[in-house]
Amino acid sequence: MQIGNTSFRRYGIGKVLYELYTKFTYFLPILVSNYKFRHLLLLPLYKEKAAANYYPGGNKKVIYMVINESTFSGGLSDRLRAIVSVYQECKRQGLDFYINFETPNLIDYLQPNEYDWRITEDEICYDPKECYPCTILTYHTDIKDPYQRFVQRTLLRHFLKKRYRQIHVYSNMVTSDAVYGKLFKELFRPTDDLQKLIDYHLKQIGGRNNYISCTFRFRQLLGDFKEGGDMLLKEEKEKYIQRCLVTVVHLHEQYPGECILITSDSNTFLKRVSTLDNIYVIPGKVVHIGFTYNADRQVYMKSFVDYYMLSYARIVFLVRDKLMYHSGFPYRAALLNDAEYLEIMLSQ
């Protein structure tokens, strides 16, 4: 009998073996990646930095880390959900929590709200004898899977128990939907520059909860975004764009009179969709923060504006098909201010 057989995994020894198999497949990739990234990337990098770094000591610190070399942590929403997850556990244990987020420099866009998470470079220890860098990555696509959250939380608690002065966490681990918005707001509020842009666009579009949003996540399909994934042939791109435009038209038919905020990683598509009636597009170029380290501050700013503007929509839609990426960005934004979230299939 195969372990994937439904009858086999429901009863007796089959049930026991299936549970062990399931636990193994959740824990193993996270542990293997932690070993790999620690020994092949982080520890050699830390040894180089330790030679030029003096650490003054102090209380045990837990630091969520983003450095240019840590592309494995994913995009903006992946990192924000992990920050909230690590903060939640530190709050539960009474541990000091900090964020070191390079490229973009997080403090240019989000500032501390109720909890001060700022830390300076000279407060960060890179001596492997004093600090423990670790990774907790997400390998199962179902981010709502409670067992995945359990496994990641268990490993985080294991790492936090280690007897080092600092624990550096590199992660895109998932968090509980129920607490995300609350904990995010404890940590963050927009900087003055970001808030001005949010206020401007809210005024232009009609205010909070007076519009709906629709997100298209193409990756490299249209050939104008730096990330992984397939690229459509030239003759296929126009047909695909037309299908996307028809999807927006159908959405207008379902919600007549509603202004639709369109967000996307494709400037090509944003230019095309902006010609439709009652469409709002936030100007600016979009980049993936895991693949772009040298963009202008205002380029990174657009991702944060998009995030907040999605959160203030009445309904947040994500367009899906077998080619487009199942982005967590609009879903996480919807959680921020309790917007309704729906996924719709691309028109044929």
Question: Which role does the model predict for each range below?
Answer:
Residues 101-107, 266-267, 346-348:
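Short beta-alpha junction loops
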Residues 211-212, 259, 315:
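Structural motif
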Residues 110-121, 268-279, 330-335:
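Short, aromatic/basic amphipathic alpha-helical patches
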Residues 215-223, 245-296:
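Catalytic donor nucleotide-activated moiety binding site of glycosyltransferases and closely related
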Residues 87-91, 202, 206, 249-253, ...:
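N-terminal cationic-hydrophobic initiation segments that often serve targeting/anchoring roles
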Residues 3-6, 14-22, 26-238:
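Secretory-pathway glycan-assembly enzymes, especially type II membrane glycosyltransferases
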Residues 95, 256-258, 337-342:
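A short helix->loop->beta-strand "cap" motif at the edges of active sites that frequently abuts
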Residues 84, 301-348:
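A donor-sugar binding/catalytic signature common to diverse glycosyltransferases
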